[in-house]
Regions:
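Short beta-strand "wing" residues that participate in macromolecule-binding interfaces
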Residues: 68
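C-terminal regulatory/oligomerization modules of transcriptional regulators
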Residues: 96, 100-160
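Glycine-centered, phosphate/nucleic-acid-interacting loop/turn motifs that mediate DNA/RNA or nucleotide
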Residues: 64-65
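Long, low-complexity, charged/polar intrinsically disordered regions in eukaryotic proteins
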Residues: 1-8
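N-terminal helix-turn-helix DNA-binding core of bacterial DNA-binding proteins
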Residues: 11-52
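Short polar/acidic secondary-structure junctions
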Residues: 71-74, 121
Length: 160
């Protein structure tokens, strides 16, 4: 079966975009990775309405990407912080790849907006695609892709 014969109904890229592919969702995740946790802080930093933020946070919690942790400041009602789950933390390479691409192709003329470095040695970090074998970073021309075991054939279009 060739790629164009494969249905995209169960495509993992499509499924991921369905969960996190919207602009505000990605910006919430960006901030969550930088340890923004509270509703008011997300709203103030990202600049979106309460309704949109509530909706996106609810969807991220329902998808198991964020979890809520109650907190209470003195004299205030109990509220929730939003923290990344293991599933949410697995999105780190995606957010870093978007940041890296943006710094290369859509950069602010003044330089980096977010300088991300390895805590231990201070070197800048970057995202690469590597082989599980003894090879380093790979270019798209150095890999092959073929339909996997979950690939389904595209259904024939209905006759006209």
């Amino acid at each position: 079966m060739e790629w164009l014969d494969v249905s995209t109904e169960n495509c993992p890229v499509q499924s991921t975009l369905d969960l996190v592919g919207e602009k505000w969702t990605l910006l919430i995740l960006r901030d969550a990775f930088i340890r923004v946790r509270r509703f008011d802080d997300f709203r103030r930093h990202i600049g979106l309405s309460d309704a949109v933020l509530s909706d996106r946070l609810r969807k991220l919690v329902a998808a198991g990407i964020l979890t809520t942790v109650p907190y209470q400041e003195a004299g205030s009602r109990t509220r929730n912080e939003y923290r990344l789950t293991g599933k949410g933390r697995d999105l780190w390479p995606i957010l870093m790849a978007l940041r890296q691409w943006g710094e290369t192709h859509a950069a602010d003329p003044g330089g980096q907006v977010l300088d991300v470095r390895h805590t231990e040695c201070g070197a800048p970090v970057r995202v690469v695609v590597e082989c599980d074998g003894p090879h380093g970073a790979l270019a798209p021309t150095e890999v092959t892709a073929a339909p996997g075991p979950a690939a389904r054939r595209v259904r024939s279009p209905l006759p006209e």
